[in-house]
C-alpha cells in the first residue's frame, strides 16, 4: 500500500482558532504608496486624486496605470455550493472567499477582494457583477451551484471585457488535465485512444469533460454518469449541459461502463467505485477519485487489488492531490499581465501542459520543506506538482 503524506492533521477547533487569532479573518488592505506626511495625504486623496480621476474619465484604460485595477480580482460567490457542504448562504461562504483571496496574493501577488452576493437569482447576480465589474481586472466565480454557474459565467463573458473564470469548473479541469497528461505519459497511453468514465455531471465534471475532448479524447470514448446513471442519447430530462455529453451506448450503469476503462474520473460521492470495478479496468488504470471530503474509492483500496494503478484524489493527505491552487493564481497572473479580455480554451490547455511539465522537474528545497521534508520525484505518486512549487 502506498504511503500517506506527512502533512499534519488538524481539528475543527484548530481551524477556528486559526481564523480567530490576532485580527479576525485572513485578509487586510495595505497602502502601496507612502502615507506618512501631509503632502502624501494630499497626493493620495484630495486634492491630488483629481488628476488621475480626470485622466481616467477621458481614457478608461488609464485605470490600469493609475489604480490597482490591473492587479485586482473579485472573488465572488452566493454560497449555493460551498465546498462539499452545499447551499449554506452567502455569508457562510466568506471564509472560503477570503481564503481564495489570500491564495491569489500568496502565490501570484494578485490583490483580491471577496464579494458575497445574497441572491439565488442568476439575473440579479449577473446585474450586480456587471455594474461593478469594470473596477476589477478579472472576476473569479466560486461555489455557485449548477446550472446557475454556467448561466452566470456565460452572460458575464459576453458582457464584460475582462476575464471571467469559474474556478470550480475550469481550475479543476486544468489541474485534472495536467495530471492526466502525466499519468498517460507514465502509462504509455495515447490520449486519443483511451476510454474514460466520468461520475458526476455537475459543473466540475462537465468542465473536465469539455477540456478532455478539446485536448483530443474522442466524444464517444467518454461515458458520463449522473445520479440516475449513464448519459445516453434519448434519455429523458437531460438539460442542455448534460445532453452535450450524452452518447449512443447500451451501457446504463457504472459497473458496465468501467469494464475495460483506462481512466476513471470521479467528481461525485464517496465509495461508489468498488474494488471489483477497479479489477475490471484496463492495464495501468488511471483513477482520479476527487469527491470531497471522501473520495469515490480510497487509494489503499485501489492498491489492494491493482498494483499497476495511478491514483489521485482531492485530499492533501494522499499523493497526487488535484488542487486548483496550482492553477488559478497563475492563470490569472498571465491573463492580467497581458490585459486579456477572456481566458479561452487554448490558454487552459497551455496551462495544463505547463503544470504537467513542472511535475517532471526536480523538487526544490522550499517545496520539500513545505511538504514536511518529502522530496517527491516524477512518477506514479507525483503526477501533479506541489502547491508550493514556484
Q: Which residues does each predicted region cover?
A:
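N-terminal ligand-binding/catalytic initiation module
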Residues: 2-164, 358
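General beta-strand structural signal in soluble alpha/beta enzymes
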Residues: 114, 140-143, 164-167, 198, ...
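Glycine-rich phosphate/diphosphate-binding loop of Rossmann-like nucleotide-binding domains
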Residues: 83, 88-108, 160, 166, ...
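Generic secondary-structure signature for well-ordered alpha-helical cores
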Residues: 46, 50, 61, 102-109, ...
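Rossmann-like adenosine-cofactor binding region
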Residues: 243-310, 315-317
